[in-house]
């Protein structure tokens, strides 16, 4: 019986033997595709190839693609652990044809791999296939070409309420490539409930889809017309976990070898004896998605991809709590995961220390609020009426205790209670927009400039070339000419202009001809062509016209200084902080460089100095900057670093600076590092959980910055009547003096407050043997109020004291209760009751609590409400 790792390798070996290029799994973070939150299918990395926007050196490919479906449109999170086949992370085995073979070979390849004794050897009688109702060609290949009996072939029509809306018709979107598909199902046997595809019992588990083969043969236009594609293609997908369950003779994906080893480890860590417990499944699934997402550069945070990761981690931790985990456990699964994933675990293994560290930190952070949040939820669930938990409680759990809504829903589901999601949404307001930041991943991919042909880039060696205008776009539409004053996008057949990529902004300059000038403000790449964005200053510009394209060399030179310095900075960060540092984003302009990178902890000042010194050391070394073009595998073998969010072809450009830095990069660089002159870090900050940002300047800009800082230093010294060398000592003296004065002032305030307390004690009234003081005090700060409250509690014995004071437009409230009364009068509840009257809220201990408000005009109302409550409850 084959292991999952052996099945994965067999699939790749089979298609390699059929002339397919084995392509590594792409990152779970889609490259340059804003329409996707996570990679969720094998075809994602080939999307531009299918759309005709990219070319590869091969026409046949095969992959074992890592996928995540959690968050966004494809969200399996709530079902994970409760069904046999839902996962947040899975592997999709796929074979692809880019205008090469089509239906006949695709079908025969699939059948051979599944049934041949040399490969998987499945019994033919256990397999059923579906085809699109009108796809007679596929039906004929299955029946006559392969020999599948007619009673094992099922035609599926438009079963989703519209033309071409079918389980057996695939489309990339409302427009674009689409076509019929054929699916292969495995029959688990009569002992499992379920019916054939298309029957009323099709949702059962007897007949399970294992392979989907899509025939991309049409291009759907906006009016619904189907045009035949000139080069039909094939896109297939087979879930590795599903086919492993078939081969290993089990009906649930969670019973295959990978999951059984993970489940056993979870049980060991938590002490759980029942290996069928669904919480074990949840955790075993979630460690896969979490570890691979972190390895691919996602950091837990409160927005976008990072928030989805945080939700998955917290769901796993909550299920660990259910199993009885007393300590951090989740990160301890990483070594087992690496082992069971075999060769597919190499990416996690390379970043194992960082993956484990981030998982541990996230679990520790959530553990601080988990038990208190669960206690609040348990109390709320006891009081639930009509089987619905209020949105207000769900929001409080989210806002105060860090419970994602689906985690709360998970707990409610176990008790057959649903959440008032509309109420939750109302409470979310602005915070909902942040937590749902994934919604920004919704750009229509078809809304791009599509132009036949390519633009040849001459900019590595030239700053000026002669070129022909191949297309013009004005106000989003293709036009034949533009006039002076109009802003447009100009497409050229050749260009020296660098198009924005890899964080480097696009070149500026001008396009000129006799009596014509077009000022280029930016350059962008659209598929295989370069768009020169700007305004026509003089004359007219026509498609087909020959012009001179001239780059602004001063702008480019300043930009190249910053780009080369960014490479040196990246290398220095990895040397000083560790190899876990990975680029998360960058901006390289003519004025500044900005570099965002994974770093779970704050950077110490001495580390920043070391990084800066290291960069300047390699600038002074005046390394030759060498660029080479080579196969991507060779580049990676040499240690070249790839940049986050960039897409690379089979052949790449490598930029090397001495032995210090080597990266894949298509950008413009200096010839020697000495040209950078000077590198100065001007800012370092956190921009998200686990992500830091460094901003720096170079060359003349760095000198200007240092001169400005020197001027500020001298002005500050003059103001403090000191010299620059003694400035720190002078400031320290002033701070010490200010602290001493503040301490003396506070002592005077407390002394005054103690005296005031003695006077106030005389105004206490008695309610059923309890001394009560409810007053507004003037000219008192919060610290003084607390001193008075503590003093009065000591003086009066059994007492409740409530004070209100006004400072400008703000209200401060302090309530104190002697410990003998806290069972029936809680300071936190009473201060909140008062705060509600003045537009505020607060809290604290049962014996001492504070609150603030913004409506001083309602102070008398707050005092009245407090008095009434005390008369009623004492």
Swiss-Prot record:
Family annotation (CDD domains): AlaRS_core
InterPro entries given in the database record: aa-tRNA-synth_II/BPL/LPL, Ala-tRNA-lgiase_IIc, Ala-tRNA-ligase_IIc_anticod-bd, Ala-tRNA-synth_IIc_core, Ala-tRNA-synth_IIc_N, Ala-tRNA_ligase, Ala_tRNA_ligase_euk/bac, DHHA1_dom
Segments traversing the membrane: none
UniProt KW keywords: Aminoacyl-tRNA synthetase, ATP-binding, Cytoplasm, Ligase, Metal-binding, Nucleotide-binding, Protein biosynthesis, RNA-binding, tRNA-binding, Zinc
Localization per Swiss-Prot or TrEMBL: Cytoplasm
Gene Ontology, cellular component aspect: cytosol
The protein's Enzyme Commission number: 6.1.1.7
GO molecular function, one term: tRNA binding
EC category name: ligase
Main location: cytoplasm
Binding site for Zn(2+): 563, 567, 665, 669
Domain of life, per lineage: Bacteria
Reactions mediated catalytically: tRNA(Ala) + L-alanine + ATP = L-alanyl-tRNA(Ala) + AMP + diphosphate
Signal peptide: none
Cofactor(s) the protein requires to work: Zn(2+)
UniProt remark on domains: Consists of three domains; the N-terminal catalytic domain, the editing domain and the C-terminal C-Ala domain. The editing domain removes incorrectly charged amino acids, while the C-Ala domain, along with tRNA(Ala), serves as a bridge to cooperatively bring together the editing and aminoacylation centers thus stimulating deacylation of misacylated tRNAs.
Assigned protein family: Belongs to the class-II aminoacyl-tRNA synthetase family.
Function description: Catalyzes the attachment of alanine to tRNA(Ala) in a two-step reaction: alanine is first activated by ATP to form Ala-AMP and then transferred to the acceptor end of tRNA(Ala). Also edits incorrectly charged Ser-tRNA(Ala) and Gly-tRNA(Ala) via its editing domain.
UniProt protein name: Alanine--tRNA ligase
Record lineage: Bacteria, Pseudomonadati, Pseudomonadota, Gammaproteobacteria, Pasteurellales
């Amino acid at each position: 019986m084959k292991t999952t790792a052996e099945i994965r390798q067999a699939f790749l070996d089979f298609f390699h033997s059929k002339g397919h290029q084995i392509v590594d799994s792409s990152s779970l973070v889609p490259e340059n595709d804003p329409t996707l939150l996570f990679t969720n299918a094998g075809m994602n990395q080939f999307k531009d190839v299918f759309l005709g926007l990219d070319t590869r050196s091969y026409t046949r490919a095969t992959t074992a693609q890592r996928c995540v479906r959690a968050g966004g449109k494809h969200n399996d999170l709530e079902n994970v652990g409760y069904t046999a086949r839902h996962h947040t992370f899975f592997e999709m085995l796929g074979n692809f044809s880019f205008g090469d073979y089509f239906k006949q070979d695709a079908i025969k390849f699939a059948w051979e791999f599944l049934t041949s004794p040399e490969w998987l050897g499945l019994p033919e009688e256990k397999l059923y296939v579906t085809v699109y109702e009108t796809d007679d060609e596929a039906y004929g290949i299955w029946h006559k070409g392969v020999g599948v009996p007619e009673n094992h072939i099922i035609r599926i029509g438009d079963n989703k309420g519209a033309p071409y809306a079918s389980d057996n018709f695939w489309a990339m979107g409302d427009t674009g490539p689409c076509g019929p598909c054929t699916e292969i199902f495995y029959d688990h046997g009569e002992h499992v409930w379920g019916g054939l595809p298309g029957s009323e019992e099709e949702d059962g588990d007897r007949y399970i889809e294992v392979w989907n083969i899509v025939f991309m043969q049409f291009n759907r236009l906006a009016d619904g017309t189907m045009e035949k594609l000139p080069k039909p293609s094939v896109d297939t997908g087979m879930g590795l976990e599903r086919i492993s369950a078939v081969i290993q003779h089990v009906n649930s994906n969670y019973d295959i070898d990978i999951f059984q080893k993970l489940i056993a480890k979870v049980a060991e860590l938590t002490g759980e004896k029942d290996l069928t417990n669904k919480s074990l499944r949840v955790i075993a699934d979630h460690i896969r998605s979490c570890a691979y997402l972190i390895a691919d550069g996602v950091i837990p945070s409160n927005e976008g991809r990072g928030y989805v990761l945080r939700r998955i981690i917290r769901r796993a931790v909550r299920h660990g709590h259910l199993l009885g985990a007393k300590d951090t456990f989740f990160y301890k699964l990483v070594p087992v995961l690496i082992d069971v994933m075999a060769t597919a675990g190499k990416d996690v293994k390379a970043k194992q220390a960082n993956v484990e560290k981030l998982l541990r930190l996230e679990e520790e952070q959530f553990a601080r609020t988990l038990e208190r949040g669960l206690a609040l939820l348990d109390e709320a669930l006891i009081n639930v009426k009509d089987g619905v938990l209020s949105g207000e409680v769900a929001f409080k759990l989210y806002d105060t205790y860090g419970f994602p809504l689906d985690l709360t829903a998970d707990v409610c589901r176990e008790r057959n209670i649903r959440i008032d999601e509309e109420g939750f949404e109302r409470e979310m307001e602005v915070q909902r927009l942040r937590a749902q930041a994934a919604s920004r991943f919704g750009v229509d991919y078809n809304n791009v400039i599509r132009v036949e042909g390519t633009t040849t880039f001459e900019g590595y060696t030239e700053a000026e070339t002669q070129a022909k205008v191949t297309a013009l776009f004005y106000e989003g539409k293709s036009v034949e000419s533009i006039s002076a004053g109009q802003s447009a996008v100009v497409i050229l057949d050749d260009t020296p202009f660098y198009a924005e990529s890899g964080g480097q902004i696009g070149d500026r300059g001008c396009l000129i001809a006799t009596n014509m000038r077009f000022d280029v403000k930016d350059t962008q790449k659209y598929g295989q062509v370069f768009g020169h964005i700007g305004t026509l200053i003089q004359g007219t510009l026509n498609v087909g016209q020959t012009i001179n394209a001239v780059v602004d060399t001063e702008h480019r030179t300043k930009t190249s200084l910053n780009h080369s310095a960014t490479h040196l900075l990246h290398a220095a960060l990895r040397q000083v902080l560790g190899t876990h540092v990975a680029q998360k984003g960058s901006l390289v302009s003519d004025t500044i460089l900005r570099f965002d990178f994974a770093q779970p902890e704050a950077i110490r000042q001495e580390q920043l100095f070391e990084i800066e010194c290291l960069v300047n050391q390699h600038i002074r070394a005046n390394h030759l900057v060498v660029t080479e073009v080579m196969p991507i595998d060779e580049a990676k073998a040499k240690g070249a670093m790839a940049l986050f969010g960039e897409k690379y072809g089979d052949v790449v450009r490598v930029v090397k600076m001495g032995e210090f830095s080597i990266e894949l990069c298509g950008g413009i660089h200096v010839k020697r590092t000495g040209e950078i002159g000077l590198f100065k870090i001007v800012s370092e900050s956190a921009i998200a959980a686990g992500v830091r940002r460094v901003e720096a300047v170079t060359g003349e800009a760095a000198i200007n910055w240092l001169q400005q800082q020197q001027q500020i230093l001298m002005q500050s010294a003059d103001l403090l009547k000191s010299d620059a060398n003694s400035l720190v000592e002078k400031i320290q003296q002033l701070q010490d003096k200010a602290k001493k004065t503040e301490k003396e002032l506070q002592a005077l305030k407390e002394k005054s407050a103690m005296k005031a307390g003695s006077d106030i004690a005389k105004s206490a009234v008695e309610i059923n043997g309890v001394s009560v003081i409810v007053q507004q005090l003037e000219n008192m700060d919060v610290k003084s109020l607390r001193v008075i409250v503590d003093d009065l509690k000591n003086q009066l014995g059994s007492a409740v004291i409530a004070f209100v004071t006004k400072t400008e437009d703000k209200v401060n409230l302090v309530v104190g209760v002697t410990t003998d009364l806290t069972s029936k009068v809680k300071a936190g509840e009473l201060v909140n009751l008062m705060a509600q009257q003045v537009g505020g809220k607060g809290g604290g201990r049962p014996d001492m609590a504070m609150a603030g408000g913004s409506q001083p005009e309602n102070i008398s109302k707050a005092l009245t409400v407090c008095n009434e409550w005390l008369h009623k409850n004492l």
